[in-house]
Amino acid sequence: MEDFVRQCFNPMIVELAEKAMKEYGEDPKIETNKFAAICTHLEVCFMYSDFHFINELGESVIIESGDPNALLKHRFEIIEGRDRTMAWTVVNSICNTTRAEKPKFLPDLYDYKENRFVEIGVTRREVHIYYLEKANKIKSEKTHIHIFSFTGEEMATKADYTLDEESRARIKTRLFTIRQEMASRGLWDSFVSPREAKRQLKKDLKSQGRCAGLPITVSHRTSPALKILESMWMDSNRTAALRVSFLKCPKK
């Protein structure tokens, strides 16, 4: 799984996710499923915001090539990907400027067009189950929830999918491709099933001769690493390097 992640995700995303996990004592070489999940969530958040701008009339526009006009403003503020202190600073600034209700938990994005925070979810399970879990945790009608699955399904608050169909299709296609590539490498079952993941982890550690002295456990809690990615990448260019193109999985 680790090799798959390094081959199939943008190197910047891999580096951010790896550093985030290590800062919380999580080893990407051991908790490889979590490593893959963090990278996937990051990529979806970036893809969600990619190419979407607001013009001088306040209208949402899509620009996919070249540098956007100076009069255009990014439609989405990316909160996911920043360290917690900076993320809360951004949230507080948004709330002070827009008078939006401050969320109890760090959201992933802020939508300047709809004036609302957005929580992005990527699930290996049924979308409605994951949606309800998110909604129960957030407990706020002010934060918009949008869930994607690896099977092409999606679910959003009040069936408001925010993005145009083509933009959402781009995300769904990427997730489906990730699933297919995992399956072709025999990784999908362990990625979906905690029991299979634990069995695979034991097998991998044994094959590496690293079982001695190591606890054989797989954490299923939401990783705090998802919220502590290094803010140094979030400069005024708004992760321009990520907007160029995402690496495609190499063929077997």
Swiss-Prot record:
A Pfam family that the UniProt record links to this protein: Flu_PA
Known function: Plays a major role in the shutoff of the host protein expression by cleaving mRNAs probably via an endonuclease activity. This host shutoff allows the virus to escape from the host antiviral response. Hijacks host RNA splicing machinery to selectively target host RNAs containing introns for destruction. This may explain the preferential degradation of RNAs that have undergone co- or post-transcriptional processing.
Domain notes: The probable endonuclease active site in the N-terminus and the basic amino acid cluster in the C-terminus are important for the shutoff activity. The C-terminus acts as a nuclear localization signal. The C-terminus is recruited to host protein complexes involved in nuclear Pol II RNA processing.
GO MF term set: RNA binding
Site label Important for efficient shutoff activity and nuclear localization, positions: 195, 198-199
Protein name from the UniProt record: Protein PA-X
GO BP, sorted A to Z: viral RNA genome replication; viral translational frameshifting
Highest taxon of the lineage: Viruses
Gene3D superfamilies documented for this protein: Influenza RNA-dependent RNA polymerase subunit PA, endonuclease domain (3.40.91.90)
Active site, UniProt feature: 80, 108
Gene (UniProt): PA
Family: Belongs to the influenza viruses PA-X family.
Keywords: Decay of host mRNAs by virus, Eukaryotic host gene expression shutoff by virus, Host cytoplasm, Host gene expression shutoff by virus, Host mRNA suppression by virus, Host nucleus, Host-virus interaction
Site positions for Important for efficient shutoff activity: 202-203, 206
Annotated localization: Host cytoplasm; Host nucleus
